[in-house]
UniProtKB/Swiss-Prot annotation:
GO terms for biological process: aggressive behavior; amygdala development; angiogenesis; anterior commissure morphogenesis; apoptotic process; astrocyte cell migration; astrocyte differentiation; behavioral fear response. The keyword Nucleus applies. This is Nuclear receptor subfamily 2 group E member 1. Residues 341-385 are annotated as: Required for transcriptional repression. Gene3D superfamilies: Erythroid Transcription Factor GATA-1, subunit A, Retinoid X Receptor. It comes from Homo sapiens (Human). GO terms for molecular function: DNA-binding transcription activator activity, RNA polymerase II-specific; DNA-binding transcription factor activity, RNA polymerase II-specific; DNA-binding transcription repressor activity, RNA polymerase II-specific; histone deacetylase binding; nuclear receptor activity; nuclear steroid receptor activity; RNA polymerase II cis-regulatory region sequence-specific DNA binding; sequence-specific double-stranded DNA binding. A zinc finger (NR C4-type) spans 16-36, 52-78. Monomer. Interacts with ATN1; the interaction represses the transcription. Orphan receptor that binds DNA as a monomer to hormone response elements (HRE) containing an extended core motif half-site sequence 5'-AAGGTCA-3' in which the 5' flanking nucleotides participate in determining receptor specificity. May be required to pattern anterior brain differentiation. Involved in the regulation of retinal development and essential for vision. During retinogenesis, regulates PTEN-Cyclin D expression via binding to the promoter region of PTEN and suppressing its activity. May be involved in retinoic acid receptor (RAR) regulation in retinal cells.
Amino acid sequence: MSKPAGSTSRILDIPCKVCGDRSSGKHYGVYACDGCSGFFKRSIRRNRTYVCKSGNQGGCPVDKTHRNQCRACRLKKCLEVNMNKDAVQHERGPRTSTIRKQVALYFRGHKEENGAAAHFPSAALPAPAFFTAVTQLEPHGLELAAVSTTPERQTLVSLAQPTPKYPHEVNGTPMYLYEVATESVCESAARLLFMSIKWAKSVPAFSTLSLQDQLMLLEDAWRELFVLGIAQWAIPVDANTLLAVSGMNGDNTDSQKLNKIISEIQALQEVVARFRQLRLDATEFACLKCIVTFKAVPTHSGSELRSFRNAAAIAALQDEAQLTLNSYIHTRYPTQPCRFGKLLLLLPALRSISPSTIEEVFFKKTIGNVPITRLLSDMYKSSDI
């Protein structure tokens, strides 16, 4: 149930002392937005030292639009407005903390007023009833509730905080510069994973299957859903940035493993570029998600071959997804008779990057050695999602 405007936890009339955005209350002694308070906390806890991008320490603009461009000047501004470093150091994380509990807390957060928390663009989608819930889910933006984490190990949930949309350019300069992307990629990856789970739970046909079948489908399709999300929401996949995010380099990683990961990142770049060239709309993405999810093929769990309880129903749902996509393209893009075939031919390329590489690059720093499949199962079963 939504809260009345007067009882919202957002302090709508007091600006952030650092960037001027709307404050969400007092953080470390001053009124600040979630983005600046989170940045300050991470910087102090990790004892970060930043170098000004322009070489003019403190001279870069720190406002709502430019706050992510120079970390050095942003941190300097935080200190200038008297954010309290000691308050960060003395903050105590939960004594007992599980991913399940933190995921539950995450989904108790409320949507930010006026749609400010909707990080991804929405669209009105003329789609059959089978996909109505699927396409309507796409724009959902979820606000992080107050979840404390230990300084040693940020969780996936703690990274899924509201941040601005990725503007493709600001004053002609790409926003996904090295420092910006390094921090933002992990946050975006966390959101994509949450969105994939919430999306699956909201597909009416998906929920009619047994829980075992649902989990098997999700565990097998999460990689493709994740890559589709990267393509759909224009998340940067620059190789240097992704390697920086993962922390891997020639000094700390076996050369064979590093070369494999670099090769798969290049494959990811290629498949994402091919999707972006075709400029898919939200309905096409929704249909493709259903096609890659409803695969009635036995899967392996370790050495065990697992079969679906209702493979026939799953196969029928995939057929319906393909028919819906074909019909939609025929109506929406009548001058592109080959478009349907081109999209289907792209789907195998979604598996060109291995699940282990995605985990290593996008999630290792946030969830450690917790297997993504276990995390998916745990979150999917949560009633809070």
